[in-house]
A protein has these predicted regions:
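Mature catalytic core of soluble alpha/beta enzymes
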Residues: 1-205
Length: 205
């Protein structure tokens, strides 16, 4: 995702829109400002943050933090920073509020399902049970400066809430640039603030 290839599209009434691919999906952000410089600076700040977020937390990127943690399962803790710790604490909260339904350690289960197979098959009960034995957010050892998965084969996947978290953060970035009217749509996960000029509502579908 190159910044130079994602230019704000100027719409009517001071409304701008940027469209791009990130986080494995199509993204679109609409926002209003009277300043062309603010429109461009917000674009740059947003795309930089999203690119950094994806590089750090995507399990599909070999050198991401999540990939490092997964490779180190059962071997050694992995150092984290304050932003990482904030994200892991959010996982704690979501796991508690959903009574365990939300669990970022379900990667072993995801790995036994081949969703790209021409003829999908259901994993055997023994494979499912074996994968379940490596699942459990409560087993994750989270410290202020490191995180550790205690058993080899355990794995994290932030796909269940990564885009939602990113939507909230991009909305905060907009506010930091003085933008009070915006719609952030990252692959169907949407948040709005304010409203477009000349109308009271954002169109989401």
């Amino acid at each position: 995702m190159e910044l130079s290839t994602v230019n704000p599209q100027t719409l009517a009434n001071g409304l701008f829109r940027i469209s791009f691919q990130a986080l494995g999906t199509q993204c679109e952000i609409s926002y209003s400002t009277n300043s062309g410089k603010v429109a461009t600076d917000f674009r740059d700040g947003t795309l930089y943050w999203i690119r950094s977020f994806e590089k750090r937390y995507s399990r599909y990127i070999p050198d991401s933090l999540i990939s490092q943690i997964n490779r180190s399962a059962g071997l050694s803790p992995v150092q984290i920073d304050s932003e990482d710790h904030r994200l892991f604490k959010l996982c704690d909260t979501l796991h508690f509020l959903t009574q365990g339904v939300f669990d970022p350690t379900t990667l072993p289960l995801s790995n036994i399902w081949d969703f790209k197979a021409e003829v999908p098959t259901i994993p055997s009960d023994s494979k499912i049970q074996h994968a379940l034995e490596k699942v459990g957010w409560g087993r994750v050892d989270l410290q202020k400066d490191c995180v550790y998965l205690p058993e080899k084969g355990m794995g994290l996947d932030f796909g269940g809430f990564g885009k939602e978290y990113a939507v909230d953060r991009v909305t905060e970035i907009a506010k930091n640039f003085g933008i009070t009217n915006a719609m952030v749509n990252l692959g169907g996960d949407i948040r709005t603030i304010g409203s477009p000029r000349k109308t009271d509502t954002w169109r989401v579908g």
